[in-house]
Swiss-Prot record:
It comes from Nitratiruptor sp. (strain SB155-2). Belongs to the D-alanine--D-alanine ligase family. One of its GO terms (biological process) is peptidoglycan biosynthetic process. This is D-alanine--D-alanine ligase. NCBIfam families: D_ala_D_alaTIGR (TIGR01205), PRK01966.1-3 (NF002527). The gene is ddl.
Amino acid sequence: MQYAVVFGGKSYEHEISIVSTIAIKDIIPGAIFIFLDGNRDFYLIEKADLKSNYFSSGNYKKSPKLELKKGGFYQKSLLKEKKIPADVVINLVHGADGEDGKLASLLEFFEIDYIGPRIEGSVISYSKLLTKLYAKECGIEVLPYQLLRKQDKKIIDFEYPVIIKPNHLGSSIGVSVVYDSSELEYALDVAFEFDDEVLIEPFIEGIEEYNLAGAKGQTFHFSKIEAVKKEKLLDFEKKYLDFGRSGEVKDASLNETLRLHIRNAFEKIYDPLFSGAIIRIDFFVRDGKLYLNEINPVPGSLANYLFGDFRAVLEDVAKHLPKSKNIVIDYRYINSIQSAKK
């Protein structure tokens, strides 16, 4: 199976996508790498050039430029164009473009097989508000929340401390913990720099957090469950480093009841909305009760470090991707009308 990894994108998480791709360059054998820059141009990148300064310096523009057309990516020359020989595209664009449905729409429009969230899954998981509404529809608890828009009065419904998050961003960008009213205005200003909507939740000290990745191919694949041990809040720089992980992690020490509860919740969220994607879901546990925190439709480094045999998972998903219905356009209705007029 020949994979083409698409990364970059016009996103606040552009650099994280680069780090994420560098981390997995040796994990997907023989992969082709396609960079989507801030102008939304595609470039074919040699594996040897997958270094952060290759992109920050602008040297990537010396790489061959690609065009996205029906069936795949193409490299043009003076006399001809050559199709890039990829069987399946892997969406590794974090944030906007990759997780909001733009790339999924393009790939589906041009009938290209890809591993990544489909349009509906992208739209729901890209919005923290829609994620919570979807989780509740699936019967999974979420923490209390309040949505605040720029034009709204800056009044919050919770006692302090609270956590403030841009509604459409990940990687801790624009996120603040607010301990009293004197800190509120500044935290909101920071969040509104990145988004027109923010989500406010109670900030609960000592809450347990667990991450589980998974995917569905011929069968369901669950990763190890990671117990997240971190500071009060991972800032962007720490998340930046976190996305570059590639070594395996230890499976969390959980009782079997909680382990099954987390897996069952994951499966309810995943199937069928995220078919064809490898996703990670972050859960909270408080007083023995499970809550969904966030859905990561394009997790850092595809969460490869959570799986015992990531390549086998990738191959199984690639072989069982969702297929669009073949709609036959035969103009039968128009032709029947024309025949009736004669």
